[in-house]
């Protein structure tokens, strides 16, 4: 009996020692994990701080966790023929803002179509978890292209979406395109790459949703609404109002929904 008690005591003693050792290892492991998490968190913080300094120093667009999208429904009910520089420090000028094109079959103003799509896009983006800032929500405004870009710049948005409709001398011209600045743009070359990527994502996804002819990304350095930008920007030419069929489609609510779905998918792809 004494031997049995002795063996039991020794067994309990060994078990206790093993348990204590396991607890020490567990504590050590947890401490190491906490140190690792703290290190990774600190490295991310340092990386973000460095990126912020770089962005401020070189005036680069900030994306990161930014979920703010600025939407500009191009044009307005009444144009403003007063002149403004096409870019910072430019001697060349353009009208501050025009009324835009008119549908060849519907007679509908481009500015109104742009606004209809913009309001739908706002709703869809907000439902998708984005913050949205609108340049205009009505036709009765007087906002120049430079002023529109300044609103986007001041917001430091992740993307500036400028909605337009196209027009051409030939009624056979059709399709969707986007516009971005070149890497040699004298006013906003720092956003050229990001703007191209945004433009490519948007036009590809719109055409995938609508079946419209994909005219790709047009590079243009003469657009005031682009040249004044410091944030990634794209002008979306949704279709041709000079084309009888596309003009009707651009006023069709279900077709507008397809355009909106394409833009949202494009923004999602760009933000990944």
Question: How should each PLM-predicted stretch be described?
Answer:
Residues 2-272:
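Catalytic-site microenvironment of enzymes
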